[in-house]
């Protein structure tokens, strides 16, 4: 229905006098757009996560979008739950930092009413847009680097086995490098992403593998824990046992000795995830 110009003027004047602020929900309902993007991460304390969120936020804000951040605390059912919640909140898309990819998660993503982009796990075989690192190559390069320094007895400390990228692919690349050089992986330990996990596992396996001279850890924080265990065993990290991590965590440069690591450019992965969405 038409509104007279005189009425419009009166309404505008009343708005100005009362200091009225427009209702964003009402505006969104009218435009059918919320300008919201849901971001699901395994934990907010992670260096990889914080760098990634910084990267994607910069891209999304430039496009006039706002981020809703949810942490699953590395709990699988929370990933499924937040996909459903974000759909109910009418977000325009979801960026999911998944720690693994199973049938339940694939079905949840495929049934989502809004686009979902995976970061860190490869969903391309299910036609899910994905941003992934070449984790197998990183593992292979880690092996080559340790071997070039003279290491012959090497182990790998990873995370839970259902994490395809961080545990499976990095360890496989590492083992391939060793096999190529006629060497055998001494052990593959599994824990979580914490410094404490790296410490406890390294402490355990150092007792079982006294010839160990090289250690590849799936993340920098795991490696930092391992360095502590090596020192407590009366050994010198970087001399008696060489340690490599992944991620270029800021802690890598302040631990003693400083940690050798691979820079993963997590901020770029976040940026690319936002652009792909």
Please report, for each region that a protein language model flagged, where it lies by residue.
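Hinge/beta->alpha junction and helix N-cap segments in small-molecule ligand-binding domains
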Residues: 6, 41-51, 69-78, 131-141, ...
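Central regulatory/effector-binding core of bacterial HTH transcription factors
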Residues: 61-107
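Periplasmic-binding protein-like
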Residues: 90-98, 155-158, 189, 209-219, ...
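Interdomain hinge and pocket-entrance segments immediately C-terminal to HTH DNA-binding domains
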Residues: 22, 31-45, 63-65
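Flexible loop/turn connectors
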Residues: 203, 208-277
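Short acidic capping loops at alpha-helix termini that bridge into adjacent secondary structure
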Residues: 153, 184-186, 236-242
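N-terminal helix-turn-helix DNA-binding module of bacterial transcription factors
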Residues: 1-35
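Flexible loop/hinge segments that line or gate small-molecule binding clefts
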Residues: 74, 96-141, 221, 247-259
């Amino acid at each position: 229905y038409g509104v007279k110009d005189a009425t419009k003027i009166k309404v505008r004047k009343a708005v100005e006098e009362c200091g009225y602020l427009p209702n964003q929900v009402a505006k969104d309902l009218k435009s059918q757009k919320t300008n919201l993007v849901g971001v699901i991460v395994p934990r907010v304390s992670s260096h990889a996560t914080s760098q990634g969120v910084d990267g994607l936020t910069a891209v999304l804000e430039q496009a006039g979008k706002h981020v809703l951040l949810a942490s699953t605390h590395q709990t699988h059912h929370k990933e499924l739950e937040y996909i459903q919640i974000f759909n109910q909140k009418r977000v325009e898309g979801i960026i999911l930092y998944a720690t693994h990819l199973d049938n339940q998660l694939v079905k949840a993503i495929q049934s989502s009413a809004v686009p979902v982009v995976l970061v860190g796990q490869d969903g391309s075989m299910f036609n899910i847009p994905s941003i992934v690192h070449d984790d197998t190559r990183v593992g292979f390069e880690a092996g080559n680097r340790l071997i070039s320094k003279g290491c012959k007895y090497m182990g790998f400390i990873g995370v839970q086995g259902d994490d395809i990228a961080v545990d499976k692919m990095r360890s496989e690349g590492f083992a391939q490098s060793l096999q190529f050089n006629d060497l055998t992986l001494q052990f593959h330990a599994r824990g979580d992403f914490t410094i404490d996990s790296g410490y406890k596992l390294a402490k355990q396996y150092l007792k079982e593998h006294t010839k160990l001279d090289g250690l590849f850890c799936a993340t920098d924080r795991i490696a930092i824990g391992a360095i502590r265990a090596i020192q407590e065993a009366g050994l010198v990290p970087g001399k008696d046992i060489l340690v490599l991590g992944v991620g270029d965590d800021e802690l890598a440069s302040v631990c003693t000795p400083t940690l050798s690591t691979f820079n993963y450019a997590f901020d770029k992965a976040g940026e690319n995830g936002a652009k792909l969405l």
